[in-house]
Regions:
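Conserved N-terminal phosphate-binding loop of PLP-dependent enzymes in the Aspartate aminotransferase
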Residues: 1-207
Length: 207
């Protein structure tokens, strides 16, 4: 929610581009950019959203040319959607389009972040740099905590965004403990090794 709000503040626009089969949350703007009509209430219809198939750069650029888009939000691996992902060429192309049309690129790493892919964030595999990164879930290893990272080009101001339970000391300790465990227990290296093993074994299973 805060990632989308910040993108709107930064660009002074309100339309968002998202992708079919994606999931970004259950609050106002986040649920509006989620491709699931069952959880979108009529009150969310005020949001200006356009959904595209994952990989459709041509469609995205046609929409960006209208100059009314504040953000493109994407999961580099669609968690709830069934682990769908596109090719590196798509993510790099999307990144370039956002730069070309001065649109904020939001990487939703709530499900894929914190080492779950072998990289700290899933977008790193594609060598792109989002403007905003949203994170949660793995951030606290089960303890409720979330946040966003913003590019230095975005000038946030005190009080611009807020959260009722923000700055919780216990949540911060949980987050630090997770970072320590990832480093000390070499969890990302283990993910990389186990991934190669899994792919090797899975490839022997008949289609």
């Amino acid at each position: 929610e805060n990632a989308l709000k910040l993108a709107s503040f930064q660009t002074n626009k309100k339309k968002v581009i998202a992708f079919k089969n994606g999931f970004h949350g259950r609050t106002s703007a986040a649920v509006a950019v989620t491709d699931n009509s069952k959880i979108i209430a009529p009150i969310n219809a005020q949001q200006e959203i356009e959904l595209f198939n994952l990989g459709d750069l041509q469609g995205v650029e046609a929409a960006l040319k209208q100059q009314d888009v504040c953000a493109v939000i994407i999961e580099c691996i669609q968690g709830v959607g069934g682990l769908d992902e596109s090719k590196t060429s798509f993510y790099r192309g999307l990144h370039l389009l956002c730069k070309k049309y001065e649109v904020i690129l939001i990487a939703d790493e709530v499900q894929s972040g914190f080492g779950r892919t072998g990289d700290f964030f899933a977008f790193q595999k594609h060598k792109i740099t989002p403007d905003i990164i949203s994170m949660a879930k793995g951030m606290g290893n089960g303890f409720p905590v979330g946040g966003i990272l913003i590019h230095s080009s975005i000038k946030a101001s005190f009080g611009l965004l807020g959260t009722t339970f923000g700055g919780n000391h216990l949540a911060c300790v949980a987050g630090l403990s997770v970072l320590n465990a990832i480093e000390e227990e070499h969890l990302m290296e283990n993910v990389t090794e186990m991934s190669a093993y899994f792919v090797k074994i899975a490839s022997t299973i008949p289609q």
